[in-house]
Design a protein with these regions (language model features):
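Charged, amphipathic alpha-helical oligomerization/scaffolding segments
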Residues: 15, 19, 23-26, 149, ...
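Short, amphipathic C-terminal "tail helix"
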Residues: 308, 321-341
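Hydrophobic, well-ordered secondary-structure elements that form the walls
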Residues: 258, 312, 329
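Mg2+-dependent prenyl diphosphate-binding active-site environment of isoprenoid biosynthetic enzymes
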Residues: 35-269, 334
Length: 341
């Protein structure tokens, strides 16, 4: 596979990447009251946060503010809060999944120990509300509305994580496509799309119509983002996945691909056996992917993600938005299902 060509959205992310990184660093620099607190808490959390992905979540929050007539900078505390949430959630998620690699590096619980990693994740989650509360540029009523969005996001994400982990723990293979969509919407779509956009639009002074349209756009694109993540874990490359390749099979994840394939009686028992085995054998992992291809499940998931992209674009079609921001949102929807890492 080849890398997709540069798009307006990827150019936007690259343009503002250093800006949001520099702002995020301010939440860790000089915060510790002793060298040991720095060593055991702020340094590892700062390093984890700095080892960034593309920063699309905070940057689309800031973009949403401009889309409804506000300023880009006005939403940066909410943007940072969402990135703090992701740091905490990912640190804890890696512990729950016994993960090995995150963003090309060993997971924090492997380098710092489980106890300190949990504590770092706890601090990151606490910083979600603190970051917004401490922003002197936001009016109190706006802070309350944004905090409502953020707390709802946290609850929904934790609910989705409960389903994801619970199905594996209980050996559940009776999961339907609708079950998967509910889980992935909760676990990923709120914090990867809906909440960043809604919070940014609130800060930017958007109307109820604008806020809800951007929320709907974010739910659709956020779900498409998760489905593409599932696909990349299976059929991407080990290098593009930062060595975290086909781990969804090893961990027995009920992805959309797996759930669809399980509905094929010809392969149900074999898929169930592989997903239940915890195997890291490359031959077994390749066999699972072969089955997913034979059942048409990979194509099914890709088509579903494309359909979500179309629904997302329709959600903002008739809503008044800044033209440049609209162009970036449409490009974002395409990027979420075209990216290769």
């Amino acid at each position: 596979m080849r890398e997709p060509v540069s798009s307006p959205f990827t150019s936007f992310l690259a343009q503002h990447f250093d800006q949001i990184n520099d702002y995020l660093a301010t939440f860790f620099d000089g915060q510790a009251t002793s060298a040991d607190i720095e060593r055991y808490l702020y340094t590892p959390l700062s390093a984890f946060t700095a080892n960034a992905g593309k920063r699309h979540r905070p940057l689309i929050c800031m973009l949403a503010a401009t889309a409804v007539g506000g300023s880009f900078e006005s939403a940066r505390s909410a943007a940072a809060a969402i990135e703090h949430f992701q740091s905490g959630a990912l640190i804890h998620d890696d512990i729950a999944d016994n993960g090995q690699i995150r963003r090309g590096k060993p997971c924090m619980h492997l380098t710092e120990g489980t106890g300190l990693a949990i504590n770092c994740g706890d601090l990151a989650l606490t910083m979600v509300t603190k970051t917004v509360l401490d922003d002197p540029t936001l009016e109190s009523d706006v802070k309350l509305r944004v905090l409502h969005e953020l707390t709802e996001m946290i609850v929904r994400t934790i609910e989705g994580q409960a389903l994801d982990l619970g199905w594996v723990r209980d050996g559940r293979f009776d999961i339907s496509v609708d079950d998967y969509l509910d889980m992935a919407t909760h676990k990923t779509a709120y914090y990867s799309g809906a909440t960043p956009l809604a919070a940014g639009a609130i800060i930017g002074g958007g109307s109820d119509e604008q806020i809800e349209a951007l929320r709907a756009f974010g739910l659709h694109t956020g779900l498409a983002f998760q489905i593409q993540d599932d696909l990349l874990n299976l059929i991407g490359t080990k290098e593009a996945a930062n060595k975290d390749f086909r781990t969804d099979i090893t961990e027995g994840k009920r992805t959309l691909v797996a759930v669809h394939a399980l509905s094929d009686e010809r392969y149900h028992d074999e898929i169930e056996a592989i997903l239940s085995s915890g195997t890291e054998d490359p031959a077994q992992l390749a066999r699972a992917v072969e089955i997913f291809q034979e059942t048409g499940s990979i194509d099914y998931a890709h088509t579903y993600a494309l359909d979500l992209t179309a629904k997302a674009k329709a959600a903002i079609e008739d809503v008044s938005l800044d033209p440049h921001a609209r162009e970036l949102f449409l490009s974002m929807a395409d990027f979420f299902v075209e990216r290769l890492n």
